[in-house]
């Protein structure tokens, strides 16, 4: 595991974009595992800038997203498809047919999870998986559980996750109660993982990287992966020995 300490959010975003850029340059037809949320927005802005400057070409890149709310259509302004389109896809030359996100409008959970697992498998897996870190240690929507969930599955969101996401909706009642998410096994099968974390995650980042490996802290499983890059600011790393 390699840990890069950065000065602030802008520096963190730049270093994370460096890792992604290197992946795209060395393997133009790579499969990127993408994440949503506030943390990667700065990284995506960096990638857009590099594309617009002629330094990156996404024309052959394929992408798979970690998760999607169940029950939200693609054009809903809080769907993760909408997030990816507005924060990255529309401003780079990626082929939208090569972008993959769980279908939140598929009511049959088993059917959609099986379809998404097959999509990832058909691509040969993920070359670089980008992850954010939830306050309770979740990655994707893999919440603290008694066991590590393996493949893509439908989850009931915890109250803490609903609370964290309600700022994006009119009220907490409007936050979806379920989501489709890649499982821990799928994430761990990525050839390389990039974990990006900001200042308000110091305690959980310490627990994830230095504490016991437990499904109660889903991100702790990353300690077992052989190629993890952590990019975090000084505040996020302040509790690390």
Residue ranges, per PLM feature:
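Glycine-rich N-terminal segment of FAD-binding domains in flavoprotein oxidoreductases
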Residues: 26-52
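A glycine-rich helix N-cap at a beta->alpha junction
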Residues: 56-62
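Conserved phosphate- and dinucleotide-binding cores of soluble alpha/beta proteins
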Residues: 4, 72-78, 82-86, 90-241
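N-terminal glycine-/serine-/threonine-rich phosphate-binding loop
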Residues: 1-32
């Amino acid at each position: 595991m390699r840990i890069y300490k950065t000065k602030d959010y802008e520096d963190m975003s730049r270093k994370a974009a460096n890792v992604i850029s290197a992946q795209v340059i060395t393997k133009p037809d790579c499969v990127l595992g993408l994440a949503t949320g506030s943390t990667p927005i700065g990284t995506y802005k960096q990638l857009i800038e590099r594309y617009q400057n002629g330094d990156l070409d996404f024309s052959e890149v394929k992408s798979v997203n970690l998760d999607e709310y169940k029950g939200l259509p693609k054009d809903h302004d809080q769907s993760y498809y909408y997030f990816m389109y507005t924060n990255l896809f529309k401003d780079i030359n990626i082929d939208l047919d090569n972008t993959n996100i769980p279908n939140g409008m598929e009511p049959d959970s088993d059917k959609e999870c099986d379809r998404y697992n097959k999509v990832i498998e058909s691509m040969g897996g993920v070359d670089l998986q980008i992850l954010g870190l939830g306050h309770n240690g979740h990655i994707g929507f893999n919440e603290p559980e008694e066991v590590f969930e393996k493949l893509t599955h439908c989850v009931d969101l915890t109250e803490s996750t609903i609370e964290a996401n309600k700022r994006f909706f009119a009220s907490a009642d409007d936050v979806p109660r379920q989501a489709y998410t890649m499982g821990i096994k799928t994430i761990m099968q990525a050839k390389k993982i990039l974990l990006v974390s900001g200042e308000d995650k110091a305690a959980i980042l310490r627990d994830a990287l230095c504490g016991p490996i437990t499904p109660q802290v889903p991100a702790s499983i990353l300690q077992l992966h052989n190629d993890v890059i952590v990019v975090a600011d000084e505040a996020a790393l302040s509790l690390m020995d």
